[in-house]
């Protein structure tokens, strides 16, 4: 029997695009019947869920790693409401953080897809998000829905988001394919992801997906800090990804020029038109589309560089070390 044809970056993004579009159009929208009075809220999660929580910073709230609360045994200062985010509802640090907040008399909210879960059982209020029925080699579907749940809790009408995001995916794919084609033929030693706060959630998600897909050391860097610190990286091969939104273009360009003089490869990803900039809550939609782009970019880069996602199963994937054990 002939071997199955090897997937290419373009074929992988085409398959992922079709699958995610179908799942989005088939899923019910994320809705919130009533927006909770959050006061001064802190959103906590881990991994993809923390990236989802960063959406809340656009609305004046804070987002922290759930482990920073749980393992320091210290609740955030000036916090009225703790919002726990976990798709499964079983992430150990997130459940424990919510329990700490509940026991201290704070208001607690859970954002999850699982109504019968330890996280949901702990919260005063539960905001359920639908699960997208889609198979993914490098996942983003959970984040797409949890991030909508975060936005909805913050008062955004997310009812049209699935449709709007589905309509944007061809443009997202075209952007990704163009940038993957321009990547160096071999993997860098490490990667920096630069952004302004308007894309902090999407940038964080790019970091997560590049680590999962490519197995490289990847970090997120505030734009201005790249000129103060990243300027000294080298002489080893280094890839700098600039995620650009509506603001700061001239500063991105100047810093890109400076970083290139040190031998770095700089890739500028313009996210302004990944979604309709005139749509209601366009900034949140753009951040979601940026996260999807990062997922497909990471998978494409892994294929280009011959690096199997999740180290090809060479590490234990049962995730027991992050689940609730009591």
Residue ranges of predicted features:
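C-terminal active-site/capping subdomain that shapes the small-molecule cofactor and substrate pocket
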Residues: 237-306
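Short alpha-helices
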Residues: 112-163, 197, 275-326
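Cofactor-/ligand-binding subdomain signature composed of acidic, glycine-rich
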Residues: 1-30, 144, 153-156
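Anionic-ligand anchoring segments at beta-strand to alpha-helix junctions in alpha/beta enzyme folds, i.e.
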Residues: 26, 30-80, 185-235
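Glycine-rich phosphate-binding loops that contact phosphosugars or nucleotide phosphates
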Residues: 36-166, 170, 241-271
């Amino acid at each position: 029997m002939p071997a199955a044809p090897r997937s290419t970056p373009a074929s992988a993004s085409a398959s992922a695009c079709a699958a995610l579009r179908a799942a989005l159009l088939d899923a019910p929208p994320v809705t919130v019947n009533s927006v909770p009075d959050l006061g001064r809220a802190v959103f906590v999660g881990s991994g993809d869920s923390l990236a989802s929580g960063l959406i809340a910073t656009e609305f004046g709230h804070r987002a922290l790693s759930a482990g920073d609360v749980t393992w320091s045994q210290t609740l955030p200062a000036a916090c009225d409401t703790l919002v726990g985010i976990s798709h499964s509802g079983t992430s150990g640090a997130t459940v424990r953080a919510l329990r700490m907040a509940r026991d201290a008399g704070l208001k607690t909210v859970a954002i999850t897809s699982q109504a019968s879960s330890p996280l949901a059982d702990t919260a005063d209020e539960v905001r359920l998000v639908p699960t997208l029925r889609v198979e993914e080699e490098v996942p983003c579907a959970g984040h797409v829905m949890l991030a909508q749940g975060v936005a909805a809790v913050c008062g955004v009408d997310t009812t049209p988001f699935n449709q709007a995001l589905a309509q944007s995916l061809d443009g997202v794919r075209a952007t990704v394919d163009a940038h993957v084609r321009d990547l160096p033929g071999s993997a860098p030693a490490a990667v920096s992801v630069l952004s302004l706060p308007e894309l902090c959630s999407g940038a964080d998600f790019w970091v997560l997906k590049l680590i999962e897909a490519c197995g490289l050391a990847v970090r997120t860097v505030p734009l201005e800090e790249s000129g103060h610190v990243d300027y000294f990286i080298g002489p080893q091969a280094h890839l700098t990804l600039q995620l650009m939104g509506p603001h700061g273009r001239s500063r991105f360009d100047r810093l890109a020029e400076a970083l290139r003089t040190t031998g770095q490869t700089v890739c500028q990803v313009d996210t302004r038109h990944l979604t309709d900039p005139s749509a209601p809550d366009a900034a949140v939609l753009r951040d979601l589309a940026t996260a999807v782009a990062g997922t497909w970019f990471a998978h494409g880069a892994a294929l280009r560089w011959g690096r199997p996602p999740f180290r090809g199963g060479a590490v234990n994937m049962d995730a027991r070390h992050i689940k609730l054990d009591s």
